[in-house]
Amino acid sequence: MKELLRTLISQGLAGCYADGSLSSGEFPSIIIEKPAHADHGDFATNVAMLLAKAEKKAPRMVAETLVSHLADGSGVCEKIEIAGPGFINFHLKDEAWRQTLLEVDQIGFEYGKSGVGGGKKIQVEFVSANPTGPLHIGHGRGAALGDTICRLLSATGWDVTREFYYNDAGQQIANLALSVQARCFGNGPDDPGWPSDGYQGEYIIDVARAYMARETVHADDQHVTAAGDPQDLEAIRRFAVAFLRREQDQDLAAFDVHFDVYSLESDLYADGSVERVVRRLVDSGHTYEQDDALWLRTTSFADDKDRVMRKSGGGYTYFVPDVAYHLRKWERGFTRVVNEQGADHHSTITRVRAGLQALDAGIPAGWPEYVLHQMVTVLRGGEEVKISKRAGSYVTLRDLIDEVGRDATRFFFVMRKPDSQLVFDIDLAKQKSLDNPVYYVQYAHARICSIFENAAEKGFVVPGADGVNLDQLIEPEEMAIVKALAFFPEVVEGSAANFEPHRIANYLQELAGLFHGFYNKNRVITEDSQLTAARLFLLKCVALTLKNALNLLGISAPEKM
């Protein structure tokens, strides 16, 4: 609909320039927006205000001239009017809106998708948890957001690669190995042999038991058989990382989250990538020695202070392998990369980008892009839940999936903007009532399926486009649904472009609400066969769109509840 109006306006401007009623010859970018108030029309544009300066006329005068040249050959407009300082408002005919239903029916389960990405490559890195324990609820929110962003990008024509980066080197992994070793020797957190920064969750006992039993674990590209020797700390490290990678993979599979590529920090050290990046940075002239440490002059690239690359003791700080990893992404041909991470990674953005800029590799200053999500608070009975028996110090993703189910967990994780803190109310997520947002949406789909069953029992068939008279749909509740369906592709494009999955969750609640409101006020099966057919056709389009939108969130559309 918006494209049709843009064409109408462009043709009107061409007519104005052709007869001299306007003289600038400019064709500005035509923005078509939905007005805040319904009485201002279905769509509005400020194009006259954009042209006023070039035309040396008041915006309303430009608007009046343009409107007089708008030839609505397709007959979609009921009324075109000028409002305020020069807005042009378009009121569309109901008949034009109802054509949306034919489009939904024709496109079916592809409705809402587009090709705006043009098949271009984009890599999305998300979750990227350290393999030191079960995934926590922060990882869960990142998994839901990252996976939904990937689904949205794929739906809008991008060639998406999903990637998980394991920080399997460094002090945290060393602490993991020491913790497992202590358990192998029968020591616990209260014993003298326990490491000062050891991991205390029950899962460490499971790792130690499996290691001593010489089990073999399979995690993506790794197959590791335990040595069973409690003295071999390196063997313990390798096995513990593989064991916990497998556990994380299983949790993500239960969450219906999958990856195309797994990358390991340890590989960057093993194949020399980290050392090569350090040499390139030194050769670039952006480093200096101070206090027996190697520094990168990141203040030359918008950082608030210079950063240590190599500590005085000889080890590299964590952002050095991060720079090496992102350089590898660039060299793999990903000119567009999105990192979905927790907000606690905010400080790393500037230094990673600075390191990449210092390489003089032609990487744009704003590369990569970031989506940062805020923390999650879990409530049960109005009280915050802080610990899990298995993890020891935090609530795990598996805890939530097991208690409230995958669908509710995914919906709750994405129903707020990523940069908003999220309160996950377990009691609400488990409710089978319309107060529960995911139940509210899924029940709308199941309710429509039930209506179809009831219609079939009474001899009615859900019609195709050829067997329906859409002019029967005249009630305000019906037209509100039709208009909401028409905006779905735009919602998908906006959600993908801005990495904001919550827009889909909001849309689902809005559409479900419109359906419930319609159903509570109107009968679907009536004595008028044409009206019944039209309403069944309308509900078929609603069910299709609900299912398409739920699929973008990785959530099922049940037919019975």
Curated annotation (Swiss-Prot):
Coiled coil: none annotated. SMART domains: Arg_tRNA_synt_N, DALR_1. Keywords: Aminoacyl-tRNA synthetase, ATP-binding, Cytoplasm, Ligase, Nucleotide-binding, Protein biosynthesis. GO terms for molecular function: arginine-tRNA ligase activity; ATP binding. InterPro entries: aa-tRNA-synth_I_CS (IPR001412), Arg-tRNA-ligase (IPR001278), Arg-tRNA-synth_N (IPR005148), Arg-tRNA-synth_N_sf (IPR036695), ArgRS_core (IPR035684), DALR_anticod-bd (IPR008909), Rossmann-like_a/b/a_fold (IPR014729), tRNAsynth_Ia_anticodon-bd (IPR009080). Gene3D superfamilies: Arginyl tRNA synthetase N-terminal domain, HUPs, Isoleucyl-tRNA Synthetase, Domain 1. It catalyses: tRNA(Arg) + L-arginine + ATP = L-arginyl-tRNA(Arg) + AMP + diphosphate. A motif ('HIGH' region) lies at residues 129-139. CDD domains: Anticodon_Ia_Arg, ArgRS_core. It is found in: Cytoplasm. The keyword ATP-binding applies. Pfam families: Arg_tRNA_synt_N, DALR_1, tRNA-synt_1d. Its EC number is 6.1.1.19. It comes from the Bacteria. One of its GO terms (biological process) is arginyl-tRNA aminoacylation. One of its GO terms (cellular component) is cytoplasm. It is an enzyme of class 6 (ligase). NCBIfam families: argS. Monomer. Belongs to the class-I aminoacyl-tRNA synthetase family. This is Arginine--tRNA ligase. It comes from Geotalea daltonii (strain DSM 22248 / JCM 15807 / FRC-32) (Geobacter daltonii).
